[in-house]
């Protein structure tokens, strides 16, 4: 792990950096940045530059795939957002955006397949629709209003976003607050925003517009057509929405808990979508059952026994002045306390 930030009620309650990383270091988002692209598509539609029901050829030109014209014109921006283009993801390089790599497999909307190339081509869709480079449009519509920083850069066929960790956390807060930042409603198209964070099709219920969704009855994963009859992350809240990228680039947003957490770093597993690692992190978050001790019920709870005192990494310590520590009691409650000198 390079960085981990946990926010509750809009405030940072845990921020840690590791392995030479700091709050000034930039790192790549991998596929977690698909969610930024989804947001920008919504902004472009809101401003009248495009409609997600438009054929993608309107913005990519004719012959952007190896399909015949009838097949190609059926592919829409919506299909690119939902991974339902029908293009063959089993080609030798599924990241390749050249027309000879984009082969017909099935009709658009009939098959869900995690395919990077059609997603990557949303960048020129945005650029051609708005007449602006992706970084200029992103700065105007997202970065500047929220105080985020970052940059999209091409690496081969891949369109990769780099930012500092707090910028990733800011994006999570924006989503938590329904597209509102400090009273400024950045995305006013509530229909698009809600569609973005809900099941976009019935093939993979756990996928919105490039966002992963928890609490559904089934899910599919990259590289497979198998349907798992379970929630994506069973130990997490059902209203969790997630941005998931290769090597464990993660944003989790939980409206019911007013909670956001992000993780940047190196490879925790070999998955394009680190959902297993995401589950492991929730095992630890679920142990953080912090509660408030009210003055009026102090006497009632004063009989409980203190089990141990730990730091925020779970290491047992002795009381230290001016350092926030966790006091763990035998009734399962955990309190953060600071002993002042």
Which residues are covered by each model-predicted region?
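A short, well-structured edge-of-sheet supersecondary motif
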Residues: 1-21, 251-252, 258-262
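Active-site SXXK
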Residues: 10, 27-53, 80, 122-126, ...
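Active-site helix/loop module of the DD-peptidase/beta-lactamase fold
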Residues: 47-85, 132-164
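Conserved catalytic neighborhood of penicillin-recognizing serine enzymes
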Residues: 64-94, 102, 107-108, 117-120, ...
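Penicillin-binding protein/beta-lactamase superfamily catalytic region
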Residues: 106, 147-255, 268-272
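Short, gly/Ser/Thr-rich active-site loops of penicillin-recognizing serine hydrolases
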Residues: 272-292
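Residue-level detector of functionally pivotal "anchor" positions at catalytic/ligand-binding pockets or at interdomain
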Residues: 290-316
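C-terminal tail/sorting-segment detector
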Residues: 324-341
């Amino acid at each position: 792990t390079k960085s981990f930030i946990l926010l509750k009620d809009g405030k940072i309650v845990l921020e840690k950096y590791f392995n030479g990383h700091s709050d000034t270091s930039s790192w790549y988002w991998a596929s977690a940045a698909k969610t930024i692209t989804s947001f920008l598509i919504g902004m472009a539609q809101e401003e009248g530059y495009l409609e997600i029901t438009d054929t993608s050829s309107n913005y990519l030109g004719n012959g952007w795939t190896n399909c015949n014209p009838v097949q190609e014109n059926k592919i829409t921006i919506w299909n690119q957002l939902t991974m339902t283009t029908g293009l063959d993801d089993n080609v030798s390089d599924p990241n390749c955006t050249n027309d000879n790599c984009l082969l017909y497999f099935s009709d658009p909307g009939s098959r869900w397949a995690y395919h990077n190339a059609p997603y990557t081509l949303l960048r020129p869709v945005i650029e051609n629709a708005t007449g602006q480079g992706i970084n200029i449009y992103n700065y105007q519509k997202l970065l500047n209003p929220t105080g985020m920083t970052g940059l999209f850069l091409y690496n081969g066929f891949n369109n990769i976003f780099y930012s500092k960790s707090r910028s990733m956390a800011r994006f999570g807060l924006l989503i938590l607050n329904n597209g509102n930042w400090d009273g400024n409603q950045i995305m006013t198209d509530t229909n698009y925003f809600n569609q973005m964070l809900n099941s976009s099709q019935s093939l993979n219920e756990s996928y919105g517009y490039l966002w992963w969704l928890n609490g559904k009855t089934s899910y599919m994963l990259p590289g497979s057509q198998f349907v798992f009859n379970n929630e994506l992350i069973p130990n997490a809240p059902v209203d969790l929405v997630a941005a998931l990228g290769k090597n464990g680039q993660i944003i989790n947003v939980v409206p019911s808990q007013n909670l956001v957490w992000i993780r940047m770093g190196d490879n925790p597993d070999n998955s394009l979508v680190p959902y297993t690692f995401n589950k492991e992190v929730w095992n630890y978050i679920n142990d953080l059952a912090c509660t408030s001790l009210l003055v009026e019920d102090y006497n009632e709870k004063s009989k409980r026994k203190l089990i141990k005192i730990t730091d925020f990494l779970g290491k047992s310590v002795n009381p230290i002045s001016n350092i926030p520590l966790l006091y763990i009691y035998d009734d399962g409650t955990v309190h953060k306390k600071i002993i002042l000198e």
